[in-house]
Amino acid sequence: MRPASAEITITRMTEHDLLEVVEIEEESGLSRWGWAAYYAEMQGTNRDLMLIARVAKAPIIEHQRLAGYIVARESAGELHINNVAVRDQFRRRGIGIALLGSIIETAKRLKVQVAFLEVRRGNNAAQELYKKVGFKPIARRADYYSDPREDAVVMSLTLGEQ
């Protein structure tokens, strides 16, 4: 993968990244996948759609080397973005956009026509991030999330004609 900017590097996630990925997942309050689910996903055909971001010149705090990650699946010409997360101290530095841009580039190489994701209805910051990349809200899923219970906004992005 190419660097997204001079200081952000996006690469494929490896097994060695999983403990930190789970840590970022917990910090971000995402629905819990856990180590085993990420590992199982990595063994399948979608491993090229599991990316991590590192920031050059970032202070390494204990074992923290990753700034964020994204996990998606491709099926029947569609991309489903499952998780996007960036550590608090790296937010608003373009990492989310870099991760989304890299996954979209990969999806286009795979001849994916459309990308979908769900986001918590109350997560306005994430919705704005997705809109910056071109996603549009298309539907709502009632009570999609638990702990706490919340509706999801379904967003899509057409890739095939871009």
Predicted regions and their residues:
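Acetyl-CoA-dependent GNAT
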Residues: 2-3, 9-89, 100-106, 110, ...
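Non-catalytic, surface-exposed connector residues within folded enzymatic/regulatory domains
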Residues: 32, 93-94, 149
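Positions that flank functional sites
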Residues: 40, 122, 145
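Short aromatic/hydrophobic contact patches that present stacked aromatics
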Residues: 83-85, 116-118, 154-156
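Conserved glycine-rich acetyl-CoA-binding loop
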Residues: 87-101, 108-110, 114, 120-128, ...
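Accessory recognition modules or surfaces
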Residues: 97, 150-158
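Conserved catalytic-core motifs of GNAT/GCN5-like acyltransferases
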Residues: 118, 131, 136-153
